[in-house]
Amino acid sequence: MVKDEKELNIAILHPDLGIGGAERLIVDLALGLKSVGNNRITMYTSRHDPKRCFKETSNGELDVHVTGGYFPRHIFNRFMVICAIIRNLLAALYIIFFSGQKYDVIVLDQISASIPLFKLFTNSKVLFYCHFPDKLLTSRTSLIKRLYRIPIDLFEEFTTGCADQVLVNSNFTSSIYKQSFKHLKNSPSVLYPIINTNEFDKTKQSHNFSNQPIENNLINPIKLDDKKFFLSINRYERKKDLKLALDAFSVFISNSESGGSGKGKDEIYLVFAGGYDTGLKENVEHLQELKDKAKEYGLENRVIFLITINEEQKQWLLLNCCCLIYTPSFEHFGITPLEGMYAGKPVIAVNNGGPLETVVDGKTGYLCNPTVKDFANAFNKIINDPINSKKMGINGKQRVNDKFSFKPFAQNLNTIVKKL
């Protein structure tokens, strides 16, 4: 067991320190370990672009070393998993034999391949963060692919089981982990991801969205700063079920215009904002599908599509929407509901996966069956009871501060490391 008073020398190995949810978590994990005592943190990665990374990894706040990146990421666009494993092993060999350091703790995530090396050649305790079993993230559309994955899946289970402690991002992921790795007896511990509340606090509500340089991204140019709107933030992918929000919004508006009990729905908009890459066929196709559906419903003047917004724009939207809508089912965790809650907004989300652990039904928002009827009813509750909606927003921000902010994250992480 690691002693409380000891200053720890800790290495963190991550495949690609770019910009993404896994990268944000591993950076927060490094900052959390650094904030506890005087721990020395060194990050290793096979790829790090200073122009495309979180600033903490490029401004000197965290010590980052690139190693193993000389091996290709793929071979003629194939064997990506094998190449990732080899890059991981090469980075591990550098840490073990050439870094000149002896580490008390090694932290890895995403790729477990090198864990046996650290256990065999060092006295380090190994902590592995499993965002989600890799074996469940790959398609097996052909017999060759299925056969190819058999040894890789077995290797993943074996190497994951070599860690001294495994962490996952939610109880939902923990249950999937146990189903996927049936031969592993030790249960993982849950360490929830967090949001960067300090950065969020820097954005003021006084920012005028109409002055932001995104007017070309609007399906219909409109000033949002004086409008009431529901907000959905997700990538333009079909698995995110954005159509559910659009269908529910259509029913919500239709009920109002046919004499429903809703108030002022003629002034309400639905805003979709999310990642969009013209090089990704699905992004292009799905955005057009949603635009066509909005036109079919006669809502082209009430549904707004924004693409590839920056952090400041996203925070403005969160601070000024009336409610955040979260439609993906069986998400491993889902950070967006936390962002909505910290912005002081109620959240309408599906009643499965990660949101079951972040959103408290009736207190910080509404958890709904992923049906048009249930989501439309929740839309109606938000608009018809503004006092309760405001109260839920206040409750949500308090819940994030209590459970999903940096301080409890660092404290929980420190407790886990002490027990290694």
Curated annotation (Swiss-Prot):
First-listed, main subcellular location of the protein, grouped into a coarse class: endoplasmic reticulum
GO cellular component labels: endomembrane system; endoplasmic reticulum membrane; lipid droplet
Point out the coiled-coil segments of this chain. Answer: none
What is the reaction catalyzed?
A: a beta-D-Man-(1->4)-beta-D-GlcNAc-(1->4)-alpha-D-GlcNAc-diphospho-di-trans,poly-cis-dolichol + GDP-alpha-D-mannose = an alpha-D-Man-(1->3)-beta-D-Man-(1->4)-beta-D-GlcNAc-(1->4)-alpha-D-GlcNAc-diphospho-di-trans,poly-cis-dolichol + GDP + H(+); an alpha-D-Man-(1->3)-beta-D-Man-(1->4)-beta-D-GlcNAc-(1->4)-alpha-D-GlcNAc-diphospho-di-trans,poly-cis-dolichol + GDP-alpha-D-mannose = an alpha-D-Man-(1->3)-[alpha-D-Man-(1->6)]-beta-D-Man-(1->4)-beta-D-GlcNAc-(1->4)-alpha-D-GlcNAc-diphospho-di-trans,poly-cis-dolichol + GDP + H(+)
User: What EC class does the entry list?
Assistant: transferase
**For this protein, what is the EC number?**
2.4.1.132, 2.4.1.257
According to its UniProt record, where is this protein located? Endoplasmic reticulum membrane
Q: How does it sit in the membrane?
A: Single-pass membrane protein
Stretches that traverse the bilayer: 79-99
What's a single GO BP term from this record? Answer: dolichol-linked oligosaccharide biosynthetic process
Q: A single Pfam family, by name?
A: Glycos_transf_1
Entries under InterPro entries matching the protein: ALG2, Glyco_trans_1, Glyco_trans_4-like_N
Q: Which GO terms describe its molecular function?
A: alpha-1,3-mannosyltransferase activity; GDP-Man:Man1GlcNAc2-PP-Dol alpha-1,3-mannosyltransferase activity; GDP-Man:Man2GlcNAc2-PP-dolichol alpha-1,6-mannosyltransferase activity; glycolipid mannosyltransferase activity
Membrane as a keyword?
A: yes
Q: Which keywords has UniProt assigned to this entry?
A: Endoplasmic reticulum, Glycosyltransferase, Membrane, Transferase, Transmembrane, Transmembrane helix
Q: What does the record give as its pathway?
A: Protein modification; protein glycosylation
State the PANTHER family in the record.
ALPHA-1,3/1,6-MANNOSYLTRANSFERASE ALG2, ALPHA-1,3_1,6-MANNOSYLTRANSFERASE ALG2
The family classification in the record reads: Belongs to the glycosyltransferase group 1 family.
What task does this protein carry out?
Answer: Mannosylates Man(2)GlcNAc(2)-dolichol diphosphate and Man(1)GlcNAc(2)-dolichol diphosphate to form Man(3)GlcNAc(2)-dolichol diphosphate.
Q: What is this protein called?
A: Alpha-1,3/1,6-mannosyltransferase ALG2
- Which species is listed as the source? Dictyostelium discoideum (Social amoeba)
What is the primary gene name for this protein?
alg2
